[in-house]
Amino acid sequence: MSVVKSKRNKSGVEFEMILFQLADGVDNLVEHDFYAEGMLAVKNKMFLEMRSRALEELTDKLVFYIKIANSIYPQCITEWEERRVAQGKAIGTCYAILTNMQRIMMRLRIPDNKYTLDIQNVMRMINSLKAWRKSDNKLKTKLGQ
């Protein structure tokens, strides 16, 4: 059974809260040069600027994909598939964020414990998105009937 367009509203799902925590965490890391006080040589500064831009772009993409997926209210299999593609892209973007963070940590030799909360937020985001996709599988069976 579908929801009338006039009565639709955005879901207040948990991953939106996690999303903004993750985005704030990335912004803080970029703002503070990944807390690598005094460790930055000139070549590392260039690397850090490049990786910072990449991380900010990935975070923007993540917000974009989640907003797209959350704005699709599937009423047929095609819409369900569109939503699933956006969810998949969001999950892939989370893994790209993790990879970029790991590259920065390895390159600048920053201890893991400085990023623990941010890494946990990314992992929570991935798990929430996967749970959302799993719950959408039930919707697919309803749409297929």
Residue ranges with predicted function:
Residues 1-145:
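Amphipathic alpha-helical assembly/interaction segments
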